[in-house]
UniProtKB/Swiss-Prot annotation:
<feature type="transmembrane region" description="Helical; Name=5">
    <location>
        <begin position="191"/>
        <end position="211"/>
    </location>
</feature>
<dbReference type="GO" id="GO:0007186">
    <property type="term" value="P:G protein-coupled receptor signaling pathway"/>
</dbReference>
<feature type="transmembrane region" description="Helical; Name=4">
    <location>
        <begin position="146"/>
        <end position="166"/>
    </location>
</feature>
<dbReference type="InterPro" id="IPR000276">
    <property type="entry name" value="GPCR_Rhodpsn"/>
</dbReference>
<feature type="transmembrane region" description="Helical; Name=1">
    <location>
        <begin position="33"/>
        <end position="53"/>
    </location>
</feature>
<keyword id="KW-0472">Membrane</keyword>
<dbReference type="GO" id="GO:0046325">
    <property type="term" value="P:negative regulation of D-glucose import"/>
</dbReference>
<feature type="topological domain" description="Cytoplasmic">
    <location>
        <begin position="212"/>
        <end position="243"/>
    </location>
</feature>
<keyword id="KW-1133">Transmembrane helix</keyword>
<dbReference type="GO" id="GO:0005886">
    <property type="term" value="C:plasma membrane"/>
</dbReference>
<keyword id="KW-0812">Transmembrane</keyword>
<keyword id="KW-0807">Transducer</keyword>
<keyword id="KW-0325">Glycoprotein</keyword>
<keyword id="KW-0675">Receptor</keyword>
<feature type="transmembrane region" description="Helical; Name=7">
    <location>
        <begin position="278"/>
        <end position="298"/>
    </location>
</feature>
<feature type="topological domain" description="Extracellular">
    <location>
        <begin position="265"/>
        <end position="277"/>
    </location>
</feature>
<keyword id="KW-1003">Cell membrane</keyword>
Amino acid sequence: MRANGSELNGTVLPRDPPAEGSPRRPPWVTSTLATILIFTIVVDLLGNLLVILSVYRNKKLRNAGNIFVVSLAIADLVVAIYPYPLVLTSVFHNGWNLGYLHCQISGFLMGLSVIGSIFNITGIAINRYCYICHSLKYDKLYSDKNSLCYVGLIWVLTVVAIVPNLFVGSLQYDPRIYSCTFAQSVSSAYTIAVVFFHFILPIAIVTYCYLRIWILVIQVRRRVKPDNNPRLKPHDFRNFVTMFVVFVLFAVCWAPLNFIGLAVAVDPETIIPRIPEWLFVSSYYMAYFNSCLNAIIYGLLNQNFRREYKKIVVSFCTAKAFFQDSSNDAADRIRSKPSPLITNNNQVKVDSV
């Protein structure tokens, strides 16, 4: 091992990560990685700012469920503001030359973002489950005060989950991905715990919640007497599908990296040499790319967000104040009770993600 370098598998990091020591690659590889990062940063920043502004401006989007959506957008913004630009700099310089402190902060914020994202996605799934499957208790469970407390709890748990990395020494520079990140080979037991509590367990909870919702949706749609039986509004079903797609994309983007980490933790000496570099790098940049997808999904699948996006862009282009409330029509001022169920005689309008 070089005295001033880090091992290829990311097991050792000196106090000051060097610029040299990154693997030599064809120019098109680094160009591709840089392009992916630039696209991710730009779309992440613009998209998630649009999400936050949309909820701020539109009363129809200001509800308990969307508090978690804003929290998720903040988690995605974190990486676009600090860690990803540093990774991009590392790509351009073919190595890390920003020092030990920036390496640790970058790795910490990257972990904070991903754990915050999965915990917020779990919070959204539980919220949707209560909203659709336990609608009579929803107002009490998800009052404005309670919802803010839930989001606060999510971020407290996120910080608690990431802090041990600072003491275990697992935040290290890996030249293969030009990033200071969680080193999977530092401790097998710790890596297994991270994968289980930060990925597998949340995914299991979210899967359970959405499975129960799908079962209810199928049961409701098969009922033969709609006059007496409640049915799910199409609007609520579309909102559920939106958040389900967000979950599926997160799971797909992050699963390869987590399964690689699990395999490395089980048998590091055997697995590490067998993992192709292209697979390892692809799994990381696939995970990085996920941070810019949610805002796109909201715009594609949610009509309220799509309309608000357009209003914000028009306001910006015409130099109007885009921080003002855009909910001016009479329908927007009607405060409706959130409930996913309606009958033929009693329709309830709901506007949420």
